[in-house]
């Protein structure tokens, strides 16, 4: 890599000691966790009977652009594992070298403190970013997932069946229709980046007389198998409230209700993985992209979350990080 410069990220890790020890090596950069001059108060965190110092994510890279790209990938990876909108992000790396700092960010010298963000699981985000950095399709898939999430995403509590409400239904606002649609487009594009989209055509459609075209089915099952995803795995598909016009237009090949589905409002069902990808493809190609389909007014946050969380599941699987370490292996999301 040649000589490397040091860049501060402002990302403060509370749980660095619970993950494999750094360094984490990406393509053209290296991540370490070091004591930071910006950590205020005691900087101590208790885990069980152990007390550990918080540490900052430090990027060593050959230049600013490389370090900044690494930070962007860490932010994308963190959004991938959290599955939620970000309260805030640290947007820029800060050079340790004073001359480079003055050249890039002269105002930083007059600030009493750098921007920081402290939370858990930054080491996991760094590990994901490092692995993804070696493959262009993985880098762009991460970026597209983050872009989709910024366009529209919701907190898990808002989709938790025990907190089910009707406030995430159909929106009367055109801006929301566009936001929902293009979040779906971006999320499905992340699936395309990792090569797990449905590959069908006019001459070789995905379905023939209501059944899978064996050629198309075998193809997607093989591509899933190559990245370590079982095509027989089911994926929970959120269905809330009365069926929308979109739901009525495309019958879902349900494998049965989810364990938590109760009553007429929470109708979540299990789909085979390949069927979930096919329905996501339908939402992308027939509803959300190109000229707006009249059915776009029936898109809801649940449609967006279904495609976004499917992209998350497939991307984490393709990168070798499914399930996240704090989930039970039988959890889907």
Regions found by a protein language model. Give the residues of each.
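Amphipathic, oligomerization/interface secondary-structure segments
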Residues: 129-333
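Charged, non-catalytic interaction/linker regions at domain boundaries
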Residues: 1-182, 301-305, 309, 313-333
